């Protein structure tokens, strides 16, 4: 005979998987074209020179070069640009 009453069910106990958002390449880092620089929700960072934006607001490099983070304008928008790699640097 069971010595414990049946427990009720719960509607909790689930969580969504982490989305691995954030900065993937930092300032002055040399990266190849096509590399992801920032994975984000919305436009926390805006695309600057030589940077493209995917449909999920992911920023990626359009050319080989060095990552540069800046704030611009009256709204102090954070922008990410790529300074093209010429081959003579470093």
Swiss-Prot record:
GO terms for biological process: translation. It comes from the Bacteria. One of its GO terms (cellular component) is cytosolic large ribosomal subunit. Residues 1-21 are annotated as: Disordered. Signal peptide: none annotated. InterPro entries: Ribosomal_bL27, Ribosomal_bL27_CS. It holds the Pfam family Ribosomal_L27. Keywords: Ribonucleoprotein, Ribosomal protein. One of its GO terms (molecular function) is structural constituent of ribosome. Belongs to the bacterial ribosomal protein bL27 family. This is Large ribosomal subunit protein bL27. The gene is rpmA.
